[in-house]
């Protein structure tokens, strides 16, 4: 409490001191206005020191009053003063009269002004360097150069309050670096020769440091675009403007500058055509995409003299860049859309020629390998931005504006798949594509698709897009198989593809092993890729262009992980793509036999009871494969955490929208539409329970006097309407007479309409035996009274309570035959009744699972477990059934209730239909369901207590919980009820797996400018003080925003992502 009070006092005193300095600045500003121009240098120096004192004294006060903007304004006004005078001298009259005037010549005046200007810029550069050092010293940051590992280490050592202050300090350093870049850029504008290039390089270095310090800011990329425009590099200029817009805090001026840049590019694009009168007609004529412009190679030959290979490559690369920028300009401005396919054909042809210049080991694209790889990555990034910009949120737009987005969105996808298809095709042609400079770009593209499965799947594609998609995925499969054929070096322990659809499966420990590559650093903060970047570790040092085998192997692994994730949604000529884990090969239209066991270890050995009947079970059946898949990987749960290979139950927890159809693999719940699917499901479940029947033979010896069976089944007569039977079957070392099984199965087989049977199996102990007849009469009296009541919905709740039966004569055991001469033993009859427990019979005789929707809002098939014999436990542990080993409760996901058949053991623990586990103390079971005619309420699973007063002594009837009253529910069961109906949503294309997308639009809004800008316009510079309300970095709404060291938003690759 004392510390908190001291902190408040310190903050208050700092605020007051900053406020006092701010008042002094107001008085000095009035004096400066009265002084006029030129301003007094001493007064400027004093004002600058006052602003700096406020920033260092109270960062909160500084951000609230935007102190950094007027501080930069002091320097910028001085810069404008020198630029204005230099331009005036250059534009002054050159008449003889003016030259004869005594005094310094014009050249001397310009030289003197430039010297003064450079001196001022150098002094201002030193001031901002010193301020960065002071800020870092105050907040305990290292005084050396900025690096990712130092930042991560320092941020991890701070608590909540200190972390917020440090992040504010880093943002101040970020802005100071931008100001330093601007000062260096102005130096380069008035420098000569090599000095100009050095200053521009220095400015770019400052901007890149600022971008790495705060990747979510678009300001550094905007300034880098301005530097690129000085060298007339249209490709890099457009790339940087795109990056400036596709971040969490976009720079608004970039959109206007993009319009100017695209207008200049249009003029460059027109110069590529043959100078003829009909050249403009060929662009929009009938021969769309054919002959619109001359070939790049032909243009080189027409040029005349022979040129070396590098020069030719540079010219071809420049021509492709002009075409490619023009293509993106059409998509961005949505103008001249009728020429899009002509430009796309020209761009595609140009790219094919560019990437055909030698192999990956030679000079490529006219530059070295690392620069070639960077060029391809930027091509991919610009294509991704065009798709992202065309599919951004349409909130607040009119219907006409939304319709206008349809064609650009479709065209951007067509261009992306067509151009990247050429890159993949080139990778296939290489002998060893694992070391190709194309791979970084391929990684960026496939991870983006894995994070956006809706884009990978396609939404209403036209014929042209469908063709280019098929071509791309064909090359995609061939490329992957070619790399796989090189050996297992790159595919051992490939990360699971769930990282692109479920980021919640990853924690901080795992991000340490997710190696960030140079392309990840290059695209850090790029909004469409944030889900894939979320799980990457950016704390290590990196250097562009130098990577070893570790980085190459990591890149291949991530490409394969993305590829495996995409196999669930992509199609090649309407054929699904699968990955065969045994053959290490991607297959088209051929489903591998081990489709459900490709990423799991072999199952543990079964118990002796299971081994006795092992020969009767078909392990190759889909159901047994699914059962084994659920059971696998449980032996080492206590020793390690498996994240990249989660269990099926774990995947249900986070991705419960996928269900398994035995004849069709995994599908969405709304895709199980045909009766064939229901038949396959019914047959698979029946086959599963028949396996249990085989095991029950020889494992159960049960007998109950015939009177018990008569009393039990007396009220149950064949009904002409649906009957829902909830049964709790005793599992004891007693025997049931054949008459019980005969009556029960006769009831099941003679029902003329659907019967929904849900059985819950309880394990009890035989304590204080008593005559069976009195036991049945006392136990079944409440049930008979309930059955005798009116039945509005013809529902019969049948509950066989805890039986304490022993000393039964085996004389009652006899065999029973029924239905067609087939003979059934009592054991088979009892087991078959259990096997049909969780199913309802449809009107056409097909069996389906009942009460499976629960509170999840989705429909899914029940999970199965490997059939394991339950043995009687008499060790005083409360009658808890065990299989091989006792499994703790934590193995069950807390958010879902697996729907299991009665008697089925999941994860080694006997469970009921509803797993509302709350009390770790054992407690006896109690049926909470309502009487006939009321909605079904699932019983809560509560463990039985140790044998005590409840199970000893006299037989106490169950306490009435008043659940039979109309509208009444027990307190413990309210809100837990399951809907008894099972509805399957249908889909027009049941073979498709749906996706919710990843929602990567973020807070950025990109309204379409909708205008053509005259060629006389110039790109806007960076006058921070002229429009402070649009500054994203000093806006008080963003003051509390933390540095996005890791993406705080969602997951798709749904994600995380973020890769």
Curated annotation (Swiss-Prot):
GO cellular component terms, semicolon-separated: nucleus; P-body
Biased segments, Polar residues type: 806-817
Organism: Arabidopsis thaliana (Mouse-ear cress)
Function noted in UniProt: Plays multiple roles in growth and development. Involved in nonsense-mediated mRNA decay (NMD). May provide a link to the mRNA degradation machinery to initiate NMD and serve as an adapter for UPF proteins function. Required for meiotic progression through anaphase II of pollen mother cells. May counteract cyclin-dependent kinase (CDK) activity at the end of meiosis. May play a role in plant defense through its involvement in NMD. Together with EXA1, helps to restrict cell death induction during pathogen infection in a salicylic acid- (SA) and reactive oxygen species- (ROS) independent manner.
Location of this chain's protein in the cell: Cytoplasm, P-body
Tissue: Expressed in flowers and at lower levels in stems and leaves.
GO BP of this protein: defense response; meiotic cell cycle; meiotic spindle assembly; nuclear-transcribed mRNA catabolic process, nonsense-mediated decay; programmed cell death; regulation of defense response
Subcellular location, principal: cytoplasm
Region feature Disordered, mapped onto this chain: 806-826, 927-955, 987-1015, 1040-1059
Record note on quaternary structure: Interacts with EXA1.
Residues in TPR repeats: 149-183, 184-217
Observed phenotype of the null mutant: Embryonic lethality when homozygous. No spontaneous lesions, but enhanced cell death independent of salicylic acid (SA) biosynthesis or reactive oxygen species (ROS) production during pathogen infection.
Name by which UniProt lists this protein: Nonsense-mediated mRNA decay factor SMG7
Signal peptide from the UniProt entry: none
Keyword Repeat among record annotations: yes
Annotated consequence of substituting residue 933 to A: Abolished interaction with EXA1
Record carries keyword Transcription regulation: no
Key words of the record: Cytoplasm, Developmental protein, Growth regulation, Necrosis, Nonsense-mediated mRNA decay, Plant defense, Repeat, TPR repeat
Pfam families (alphabetical): EST1, EST1_DNA_bind
